[in-house]
Design a protein with these regions (language model features):
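A structural signal for short, well-ordered beta-strand segments
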Residues: 6-10, 54-56, 88-90
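Short glycine-/aliphatic-rich beta-strand segments at the starts of folded cytosolic domains
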Residues: 4-13, 18
């Protein structure tokens, strides 16, 4: 069993409130779950209206598949129209 994790930091410059942030974060989480079949949670900075830290996890029997999927997720978030990609950490 191979477990992979991805930690991504994003910046929401236009977020005026925690409610604005929650709407964007929920949309991102739902899309990642649906498109990639992974577990996603906001893991840090919940009280900061502009910073988002997401944790993504997945399990597979092939390390290559886990790494490729998590890299695809990082690239998808890098291209997100609302959130600015700050950095990421990937572990397999």
């Amino acid at each position: 069993m191979i477990v992979g994790s991805l930690r991504v930091r994003l910046l929401l410059r236009d977020s005026r409130s925690l409610k604005d942030k929650r709407q964007v974060v929920q949309s991102i989480k739902d899309r990642l779950r649906q498109q990639f079949n992974v577990s996603v949670a906001e893991v840090e900075a919940q009280d900061n209206r502009q910073v988002v830290v997401l944790g993504v996890a997945m399990v597979s029997n092939e390390a290559r598949h886990v790494r490729a999927t998590l890299q695809q997720i990082a690239e998808a978030l890098r291209r997100h129209p609302v959130a600015e990609f700050l950095d990421h950490e990937l572990e397999v």
